[in-house]
């Protein structure tokens, strides 16, 4: 199937996306998103990533901006259609398989992050690899391979072996992403949407919540 998400995934909008377990949302609404090295951590946080890769990222240095390591930042992708989301659905890559209903997608906007003077960096490939380039200026957003993101195409290509890593370019927000910088939540089903809206209502918070089952893998 051919996709074209160029209207929403582009350097002008600079939307950034993070997937989390649905049951982490109440804590996130109360505390925002905290980096791996933060002293503020949820007691019952449900991790959905690859534990081995999470461990490796802890000591990986960030060579620009505020510096530190990858665990000093809250990571986002520039697409909601990540290989990680597919691996969670399929159970590949050392990741626990989970139904789509358990996963929600948070959306923010890197231009809004910058406007609020929250420190950030971003990369043109998966942040863990040594050949990845890091940037601190929004003027460098054109270094991201937007066409493959817009086409939702992360198939490995023997003629372009770095394509898979470029698809996983990251936006990294220093230490803490407050809830005020989140623009909305995407979920798989109407049942989950109603639950998310209830959690927002209980906290007198207003945020867009949309059901987009077609954004998930099946």
From Swiss-Prot:
GO terms for molecular function: DNA binding; glycosyltransferase activity; nucleotidyltransferase activity. Its EC number is 2.4.2.-. Keywords: DNA-binding, Glycosyltransferase, Nucleotidyltransferase, Toxin-antitoxin system, Transferase. The active site is at residues 57, 170. It is an enzyme of class 2 (transferase). NAD(+) binds at residues 18-20, 57. Pfam families: DarT. Interacts with cognate antitoxin DarG (via C-terminus); this heterodimeric complex neutralizes the toxic effect of DarT by preventing ssDNA binding to DarT and consequently inactivating the toxin by direct protein-protein interactions. Toxic component of the hybrid type II/IV toxin-antitoxin (TA) system DarTG, which plays a crucial role in controlling bacterial growth and bacteriophage infection. ADP-ribosylates ssDNA in the sequence TTT/TCT. In case of phage infection, DarT toxin ADP-ribosylates DNA, which inhibits both viral DNA and RNA synthesis and leads to abortive infection. Its toxic effect is neutralized by cognate antitoxin DarG. May target ssDNA loops during DNA replication, probably modifies thymidine. This is DNA ADP-ribosyl transferase. The gene is darT.
